């Protein structure tokens, strides 16, 4: 418009430029003679952050590096939903539809069993696959999942990604055993430009304590292995096809600025890797980076502090240029999906994206003296580490050495947390002395699902063991009861009743629990909850004899009710192998809580 005033260059002539020498002199005065070097921050990678940075920092880099290109699409808020083994995922599909209606920008299904069981037909009926961003993590048969997706959506490309994470082989070594399946995935995904099917799972390394340098280097090595071994002339798969189908998964930790720099350094090195294989380096801008909050930094104690950790981690991901963010529930270490914690996790990125608008600026870290320097140093260190690993044969040949290096770093972190050198709020500093656990410590420590790879796990074990000691003393004053309900048919009736209550309106037959027909159905009634269990007749007979102190060989009628102190019965059901009755992966108390709206 004609009345619009001309733009005026920003200038502050009233302020004189301050040189590096002047800053150093002022710093010395503020420290009253102390060595300014004492303010340096040494990271686990060995990189050193200076007390301050000046414009000369960019001069040392040869000038300000060009900013990263804008994202091809807005950053997505992705909700992860785990489909338990033995289920078809209908419950998770319902949860996915609800999450998308409440602000989620995408869904990530983690399939814990055969992909043939997953209700893709139901998914296609509930969600338009061509326009809904959906990621899939599978433990086996990735090509079969893609074949089913291709059959359901034959003429429309998909949005999202496929991540193959087989549990039968180590991370980074799946190529040797599954090369044929991965090539088949590439063939099936042709034409799906926004659905990469080759995962570089950097989160695997990060969630085991790898330094930022190691995470970038080992991820590059995994990608280089695929670029070298997946192309196939007979199948018509070129190195460009492989490169175009990568997506990179990173776990973002709480080290705020270094995490921003790590993501920026990764894109720069990705361009270098593409160039090394004769591909346009501009393709690095199209690399999908899926960032998730780190399990390595998550804590079981004082779990609400995880909300704050996840917020800084998500901020680092957005500002560093991630294309999608997946925030875990603050309490996911000790319990399954709950609507309350799921809503908080879903809303954290929404606030960052919809209220703070952190993704409205392309590469907001560009030009920062500190972040540009840190990005450059991280990139250089990671490239050196990558080249060293490649010289040993890459991830296929030298994976054990890489994992040993990660273990060494993780052990050092364990020690620093145990001695208080590294602060973990709520775990080794500023603990909540009146904390009431939302879980049973003994049950959690014995659970196969409890993550023992986290940084705070050793410290948590000590705290929980102490809690167990006092809990057992308290339980000796509490009474509990085992009630014999009947045979396995009772459990089947209970399972059917719970299933129909959880899935109102469903007319199909509910899945029956996998329980032997001669098993007993048992109710374990405790002061604060009731748990359905099952056991063989021999197990129940042995427990009854021990608890009621019946001599071996003495004939007695199996009682229908056994009373004792809680501590004794808790130990007895464990020793004699009583199994907890689960409904779609949920404990009795969880099912009852859901039915009661808790």
Per-range role (PLM):
Residues 2, 226, 247-440, 579-582, ...:
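Active-site capping/gating regions of soluble enzymes
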Residues 2-255, 259, 318, 324-328, ...:
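Catalytic alpha/beta active-site cores
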Residues 5-16, 34-41, 47-66, 323, ...:
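Intrinsic disorder at enzyme termini
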Residues 25-27, 53-57, 173-175, 223, ...:
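Short linear motifs at secondary-structure transitions and domain/linker junctions
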Residues 31-34, 304-313, 476-480:
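Short, hydrophobic/aliphatic alpha-helical segments
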Residues 63-65, 101-105, 182-186, 220-223, ...:
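Short, surface-exposed linear patches
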Residues 73-74, 246, 291-294, 364-366, ...:
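A short alpha-helix capping/helix-coil boundary motif
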